[in-house]
C-alpha cells in the first residue's frame, strides 16, 4: 500500500489510473470502514482511502484533539483489506491557508436533524468532502463509497454531487452492526462496559418506532414523542427520534407508504452521543 501525504504525491500516484474507488475516513477504523473498503474494491481500477480528522466539522464545544488517532492500526487494517493507496494529508497539506471558501448545503436538508443540534456541521463535512473529491477524483471522476449509518451525511453528499454535476458515482454501504444490533461506530470506544450494554436501546427504539408507525392508523409526531420519552426514561438524553421520507429527509406523514421511510435517532448516553437509523 502506497501512502501519499501531499496532494502532489497523491496525484502522481493516481496518474496511471482511470477510475479510482474512494473511501474517505477520519481514521480510528472499525469493521464498518473495512466493509466499505471491500465494497469499493471491484468498483474501480485503484482503491483509495483517506484518513483526515477534519477540524471544520467539529463544533466549539466538541474536542477535536480528543478524537482517537490510531494510525498504525488503521494502516495495518487497510493493508490487510487490499487498499492500494492511502491519502493521509496533514492539516497544512489540505488547508495550506485558512479555509474561508466553504460549501453551504441546502438548508432544507442540512439544517435539520444533525444540522439542528450541530449547527455548521454539514458546512464542514461538505467542504472537506468536496476538497477530497477534488484531490482524489478531480482529474478522472470515479466512485466514492459512504456508509448508510451517517444517513443525512450521505444525502448531503449525494445532493452536492448531483447539483454540482461532479463526475462521481456515490455508492452506499449498509450499516455494520455488532451481534446485539448496535451500529459500529468510532464513538463506541468511549462507552463504559455498562454503557455499551445499554447502548443497544437506541436501535431497539428505532425498531419499535418503525413497527408502531407501520401499525398505526394515523402515525405522526405522537409516536415520535413516545419513543423520545421511553428513551429518556432509561437515562438517555435524546436529540431526536423521528420518521422521515427517504427521498428528502422531510417529516413523514400518514400518506407516506412503508418502503419509502427511514427512522433516525440521535441521543447521548452519559457523555457519548450515538446516531443510528432504520429504513422501513
UniProtKB/Swiss-Prot annotation:
Binding site for beta-alanine: 57
EC number(s) per entry: 6.3.2.1
Keyword ATP-binding: yes
Functional pathway: Cofactor biosynthesis; (R)-pantothenate biosynthesis; (R)-pantothenate from (R)-pantoate and beta-alanine: step 1/1
Ligand binding ((R)-pantoate): 57, 153
Catalytic activity annotation: (R)-pantoate + beta-alanine + ATP = (R)-pantothenate + AMP + diphosphate + H(+)
A GO CC term attached to the entry: cytosol
Binding residue positions for ATP: 26-33, 147-150, 184-187
Xref: Gene3D superfamilies: HUPs, Pantoate-beta-alanine ligase, C-terminal domain
Catalytic center residues: 33
Pfam families: Pantoate_ligase
MF (Gene Ontology): ATP binding; pantoate-beta-alanine ligase activity
Protein family (similarity comment): Belongs to the pantothenate synthetase family.
Function of the molecule: Catalyzes the condensation of pantoate with beta-alanine in an ATP-dependent reaction via a pantoyl-adenylate intermediate.
HAMAP family: PanC
PANTHER family: CYTIDYLATE KINASE/PANTOATE-BETA-ALANINE LIGASE, PANTOATE--BETA-ALANINE LIGASE
Entry protein name: Pantothenate synthetase
Species assigned in the record: Verminephrobacter eiseniae (strain EF01-2)
Amino acid at each position: 500500500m502506497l501512502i501519499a501525504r501531499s496532494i502532489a504525491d497523491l496525484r502522481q500516484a493516481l496518474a496511471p489510473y482511470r477510475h479510482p474507488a474512494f473511501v474517505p475516513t477520519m481514521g480510528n477504523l472499525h469493521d464498518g470502514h473495512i466493509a466499505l473498503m471491500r465494497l469499493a474494491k471491484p468498483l474501480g481500477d485503484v482503491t483509495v482511502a483517506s484518513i483526515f480528522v477534519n477540524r471544520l466539522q467539529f463544533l466549539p464545544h466538541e474536542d477535536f484533539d480528543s478524537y482517537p488517532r490510531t494510525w498504525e492500526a488503521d494502516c495495518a487494517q487497510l493493508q490487510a483489506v487490499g487498499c492500494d493507496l492511502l491519502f493521509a494529508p496533514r492539516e497544512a497539506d489540505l488547508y495550506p491557508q485558512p479555509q474561508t471558501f466553504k460549501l453551504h448545503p441546502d438548508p432544507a436538508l442540512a439544517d435539520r436533524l444533525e444540522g439542528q443540534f450541530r449547527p455548521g456541521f454539514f458546512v464542514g463535512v461538505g467542504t472537506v468532502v468536496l476538497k477530497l473529491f477534488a484531490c482524489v477524483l478531480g482529474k478522472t471522476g470515479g466512485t466514492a463509497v459512504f456508509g448508510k449509518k451517517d444517513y443525512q451525511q450521505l444525502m448531503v453528499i449525494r445532493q452536492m454531487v448531483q447539483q454540482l454535476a461532479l463526475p462521481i458515482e456515490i455508492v452506499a454501504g449498509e450499516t455494520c452492526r455488532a451481534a446485539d444490533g448496535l451500529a459500529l461506530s468510532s464513538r463506541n470506544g468511549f462507552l463504559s462496559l455498562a454503557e455499551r450494554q445499554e447502548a443497544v436501546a437506541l436501535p431497539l427504539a428505532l425498531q419499535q418506532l418503525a413497527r408502531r408507525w407501520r401499525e398505526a392508523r394515523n402515525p405522526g409526531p405522537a409516536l415520535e414523542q413516545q419513543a423520545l420519552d421511553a428513551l429518556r426514561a432509561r437515562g438517555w438524553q435524546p436529540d431526536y427520534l423521528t420518521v422521515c421520507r427517504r427521498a428528502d429527509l422531510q417529516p413523514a406523514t400518514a400518506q407516506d407508504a412503508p418502503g419509502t421511510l427511514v427512522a433516525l435517532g440521535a441521543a447521548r448516553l452519559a457523555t457519548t452521543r450515538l446516531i443510528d437509523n432504520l429504513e422501513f
